[in-house]
Swiss-Prot record:
Pfam families (alphabetical): ATP-synt (PF00231)
Lineage top rank: taxon: Bacteria
Species: Brucella canis (strain ATCC 23365 / NCTC 10854 / RM-666)
Main location: membrane
GO CC term, one of those recorded: proton-transporting ATP synthase complex
Name of this chain's protein: ATP synthase gamma chain
Subunit structure: F-type ATPases have 2 components, CF(1) - the catalytic core - and CF(0) - the membrane proton channel. CF(1) has five subunits: alpha(3), beta(3), gamma(1), delta(1), epsilon(1). CF(0) has three main subunits: a, b and c.
UniProt GO BP: proton motive force-driven plasma membrane ATP synthesis
Molecular functions per Gene Ontology: ATP binding; proton-transporting ATP synthase activity, rotational mechanism
């Protein structure tokens, strides 16, 4: 049984930890608002660009279609771009994204495909390195980035396009977590290359309107698709930041509550033990007085 001194030390230690988790919760809550606004602001632009691409793609086919849109015609080599957070203490946020990428990689390997992985964020790299260390092609470190900007996504996009032009892969898939709410972040896989319009974009282009493009659609696509790849990566990074802050706020709230419960239990144990000690001392005093 721990002594009263040990119990006091444990209570003080848990209270100190509770102050830290409470402060981290408040910081995450403040950052979450800004991150959520940024993620929500990026969605309409990303979706409209997808709609424009889908519309233009209807007018381009065959040899005129850019390679980034039609691909190599093969799917032997797959590049997985896995975006996670640089730091932990955010519950299962990072592990859920890594698990989705890991399951996809296992499936491809079972089919005899070649898999290459680019990780964005330290936590995802640490998780995937345990099983796929030989498949890790590159790592993007954003730890020193104070404010995420489009230029960071553009650099990743240029790196991916350069690898494609060098014939390093046939299909590229982006993994990130789509922010739904503070308690809900959905791990998502999105194909970047060959560029494919999502269902929402296809629905938007299903009308009867006829568009004319200058210059020709193929030339527009050649410029727009690389831009769209960077836009989709930027949106994924913004979604990740919002999801990370939401998960961190929730995790720190749970940690603060658990610390409070532990303090209550330790305090009850301390008071009971102290009361028992006082009672014992009183009995000893009374017994001594009676003996006299």
């Amino acid at each position: 049984m721990p002594s009263l001194k040990d119990l006091r030390n444990r209570i003080a230690s848990v209270k100190a930890t509770q102050k830290i988790t409470k402060a981290m919760q408040m910081v995450a809550a403040a950052k979450l608002r800004r991150a959520q606004e940024a993620a929500e602001a990026a969605r309409p632009y990303s979706q409209r660009m997808g709609a424009v691409l889908a519309n233009i793609a209807q007018n381009v086919s065959g040899e005129d279609a850019p390679a980034l849109m039609v691909g190599t015609g093969k799917d032997n080599v797959h590049l997985l771009v896995v975006c996670t957070a640089e730091r932990g203490l955010c519950g299962g946020f990072n592990s859920q994204i890594a698990r989705l990428a890991r399951d996809h990689a296992r499936k491809l390997l079972a089919e005899g495909k070649t898999v290459k992985i680019i990780t964005v964020g330290k936590k995802g790299a640490d998780i995937l390195r345990r099983e796929f260390s030989a498949l890790l092609h590159d790592h993007v470190d954003l730890r020193e980035v104070k404010q995420l900007a489009f230029v960071h996504a553009d650099q990743i996009g240029h790196k991916i396009i350069k690898l494609f032009e060098e014939g390093a892969f046939d299909v590229c898939t982006l993994f990130y977590s789509e922010f739904k709410s503070v308690i809900s972040q959905v791990p998502t896989a999105q194909q970047l290359i060959p560029a494919s319009a999502d269902n929402e974009a296809e629905m938007e282009t299903a009308g009867d309107a006829i568009y004319e493009y200058e210059p020709d659609p193929a030339a527009i696509l050649s410029t727009l698709i690389p831009r769209n790849i960077s836009v989709q990566i930027f949106r994924a990074l913004l979604e990740n930041v919002a999801g990370e802050m939401g998960a961190k706020m929730s995790a720190m709230d749970n940690a603060t509550r658990n610390a409070g419960d532990m303090i209550n239990k330790l305090s009850i144990t301390y008071n009971r033990q102290r009361q028992a000690q006082i009672t014992k001392e009183l009995i000893e005093i009374i017994s001594g007085a009676e003996a006299l």
